[in-house]
Swiss-Prot record:
Species for this entry: Drosophila melanogaster (Fruit fly)
Binding site for Zn(2+) 1: H76, H78, H145, D163
Protein name: Beta-lactamase-like protein 2 homolog
Enzyme class: hydrolase
GO biological process, one term: RNA 3'-end processing
Amino acid sequence: MALIPAVTRLTSSVIRILGCNPSAMTLQGTNTYLLGSGSRRILIDTGDEDVPQYIAHLGDVLQQEKASIDTILLTHWHHDHVGGVKSIVGTKLAEKDCRVFKFGRTDAPDVCPEIPTDIKLHPLAHNQEFTTEGANVRVVHTPGHTTDHVVLAMNEGTLFSGDCILGEGTAVFEDLFEYMKSLEKILDIKPQRIFPGHGNVIEEPIGKIEYYINHRNQREQQILQFFVQRPNENLQAMDVVKVVYKETPENLWPAAAYNVNHHLSKLEKEGKLRVSKSADEEFYVYQPTSAL
């Protein structure tokens, strides 16, 4: 993985502060972004909870900038994006009236265990705008990675992509059907560069987004063909993996099956497969177009 410094000024109005929480899932760590050029700034995401090194770096930046945080925008509910809220709100890093915003979840109660209940979460809305001196961002709801995921479109073609698009590798998702629609939505924005939630800046984002879309579409066609060739069989994800992912080491098959299940769910939503239940187990069966 490429090295990412703890603090990087990306533009005159964007400073990236690394969350100092590296792992297999977070890559170099969570990227958080300080927006604006005046004394009151917007912070996108807050890293993990209880990471003193991150809070120290954030504090140093704010001191150098002679600024504080008055708005926190959370791209989604995962702990490595919301965990730092409690170490910022109510401290010298933030204005007394600092507000925290997050889009509501639709799959579960909209509660973040890492955020104390006395810190109010204000709802985000699709196309809502936030402005501070030197920066303006627009909220774009992009479900798929999670139901509450948003990206933030900034002036001059900059997009903050959260975990929808990563600086390295491909993203994970809860709902592939929604995720693919969100990728198309981002493609329509035509970003000129992407500041991701993990990994380095993406300077040629259109190619990256198209790669994400094409990669998933190609895999989906392989999976669908597997069913077409077995039109009357009740099949599960691992049946697909053993054939479509036969070149993949067997110890990685469970992870492959996780992805395949997302594809199967998407194909079922599109009417290309149907669900068959037998002995409390779910199977998928090919659904010919003529049967629709």
